[in-house]
Amino acid sequence: MTYLVSLFLLGLVLGLVAVASNPAPYFAALGLVVAAGVGCGVLVGHGGSFLSLVLFLIYLGGMLVVFAYSAALAAEPFPESWGDRSVLGYVVVYTVGVVLVAGLFWGGWYETSWVAVDEFKEFSVLRGDTSGVALMYSHGGGMLIACAWVLLLTLFVVLELTRGLSRGALRAV
């Protein structure tokens, strides 16, 4: 299980490097889907199966709509891929940066321990992630509304950024 979670963490870092190099909206959306999938795999590896499923469905339902709009509006005739020289340079720079930061923190990672959500499941009636969902809806209602507002604002920002010099995404048909 440790090897599987380590593989998921490596996939998460590679997915985020793929997003940060940002060759074209098509490939950046693919990198985000990979990063979200393996990030939810990390959560499943630590016992948060319900939380990871909810986060993945929210991501696929909400943010991919924004990337579908931006990919449709930024239709490039020849999009840059990860094999191009400029994009490959960014990938190398980000990978070297991740390796340097990991080397900086390498010595102290074993002093703290990661524990699963249900570490003492024999003594508990509730699961940790499902009771957290109930707490989010009871006391976190204001934050939930604020997050929905920020997602709507993000949609409008992406639509405004991809309009270019023309009238943009909000033009009359």
Swiss-Prot record:
The keyword Protease does not apply. Its EC number is 7.1.1.2. It is found in: Mitochondrion membrane. Gene3D superfamilies: NADH-ubiquinone/plastoquinone oxidoreductase chain 6, subunit NuoJ. The chain crosses the membrane at residues 1-21, 24-44, 53-73, 87-107, 141-161. It is an enzyme of class 7 (translocase). GO terms for cellular component: mitochondrial membrane. It is a multi-pass membrane protein. Its main location: mitochondrion. Pfam families: Oxidored_q3 (PF00499). It catalyses: a ubiquinone + NADH + 5 H(+)(in) = a ubiquinol + NAD(+) + 4 H(+)(out). One of its GO terms (molecular function) is NADH dehydrogenase (ubiquinone) activity. Keywords: Electron transport, Membrane, Mitochondrion, NAD, Respiratory chain, Translocase, Transmembrane, Transmembrane helix, Transport, Ubiquinone. InterPro entries: ComplexI_Subunit6, NADH_UbQ/plastoQ_OxRdtase_su6, Nuo/plastoQ_OxRdtase_6_NuoJ. Belongs to the complex I subunit 6 family. Core subunit of the mitochondrial membrane respiratory chain NADH dehydrogenase (Complex I) that is believed to belong to the minimal assembly required for catalysis. Complex I functions in the transfer of electrons from NADH to the respiratory chain. The immediate electron acceptor for the enzyme is believed to be ubiquinone. PANTHER family: NADH UBIQUINONE OXIDOREDUCTASE SUBUNIT ND6, NADH-UBIQUINONE OXIDOREDUCTASE CHAIN 6. This is NADH-ubiquinone oxidoreductase chain 6. It comes from Oncorhynchus mykiss (Rainbow trout). The gene is MT-ND6.
